[in-house]
Amino acid sequence: MKSVITTTISAADAAGRFPSSSDLESVQGNIQRAAARLEAAEKLASNHEAVVKEAGDACFAKYSYLKNPGEAGDSQEKVNKCYRDVDHYMRLVNYCLVVGGTGPVDEWGIAGAREVYRTLNLPTSAYVASFAFARDRLCVPRDMSAQAGVEYAGNLDYIINSLC
């Protein structure tokens, strides 16, 4: 799984060298942000059901046509699958916060997602709206510290940009 630490070590090993000073500074910065990432991961884990429900609700509020006949959410089963997908991505955000890199999203979420959604007639814009809502709903310090919020929002931005 890709993280700042594994990427740094892999690059140094591939070049047959020890990690450079700048490599080590990057790793140290990553380690210093670890407490904030873990705080964000803990808050997300303890509130994930509400986060997923609110994000999914925001998606269907913004794109109400999705519940029309022939659309991606025209049955309760399809609506449930959309919420399931949002839940899946929020778990991946949690994993990314824990490992300190985008590896979980890259490996289990992004690869081929746009193509799958297009094939199934699921608009990626609806998922983007869900993740943007989850990001924008964050209230510092009510929900988490400022640095934890930066880490959380950064991971959601990564998913949003990957789906656009």
Curated annotation (Swiss-Prot):
(2R,3E)-phycoerythrobilin 2 binds at residue 139. SUPFAM superfamilies: Globin-like (SSF46458). Changing residue 46 to G: In strain: Qingdao. Keywords: Antenna complex, Bile pigment, Chloroplast, Chromophore, Electron transport, Membrane, Photosynthesis, Phycobilisome, Plastid, Thylakoid, Transport. Pfam families: Phycobilisome (PF00502). GO terms for biological process: photosynthesis. Contains two covalently linked bilin chromophores. (2R,3E)-phycoerythrobilin 1 binds at residue 82. InterPro entries: Globin-like_sf, Phycobilisome_asu/bsu, Phycobilisome_asu/bsu_sf. It is found in: Plastid, Chloroplast thylakoid membrane. It is a peripheral membrane protein. Its main location: plastid. Gene3D superfamilies: Phycocyanins. One of its GO terms (cellular component) is phycobilisome. Light-harvesting photosynthetic bile pigment-protein from the phycobiliprotein complex. Belongs to the phycobiliprotein family. Heterodimer of an alpha and a beta chain. This is R-phycoerythrin alpha chain.
